[in-house]
Amino acid sequence: MKTILVVDDKRVQLKTLRRGLRTRGYQVVEAISGKEALDHLIRDSKIDIVLTDYAMPEMNGIELLQKIREHNKTLPVIIMTAYGDEGLVVEAMHHQCNGFIDKPFDMDELLEEINNIPLR
């Protein structure tokens, strides 16, 4: 069973993603900030994928991606955003983002993005 670290500062979004992913057989670890996500990654080496929102206070999704890449070059990271900005996609890919999904999305779109990532 794959474990996904879901990072979003909106609790409603976390709850929705947790329910959707768990009903499809994934284990879910939640974080409400980039800092909390990094703490989880330090403590739990069993995380298979990071699914993070882009727009968060203190540390956005790309900043989180950069911090992850400083310590782990292979952990898959998918960024979710409501900003359909092509420049944002280019910047994310420059930092070795594995996937990018525009909000709003349905669970099937997210699962397709997750399943397109080869696990380390």
Language model features with spans:
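Two-component/phosphorelay signaling modules centered on CheY-like receiver
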Residues: 11-29
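Helix N-cap/capping motif at the beta->alpha junctions
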Residues: 30-39, 61
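Short amphipathic alpha-helix used as the core "switch/output" element in two-component signaling
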Residues: 39, 62-73
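Active-site beta3 strand of CheY-like receiver
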Residues: 45-51
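Receiver (REC) domain active-site loop signature in two-component systems and cognate sites
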Residues: 56
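Alpha4 helix (beta4-alpha4-beta5 surface) of REC/receiver domains from two-component response regulators
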Residues: 63, 84-99
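C-terminal output helix
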Residues: 87, 105-115
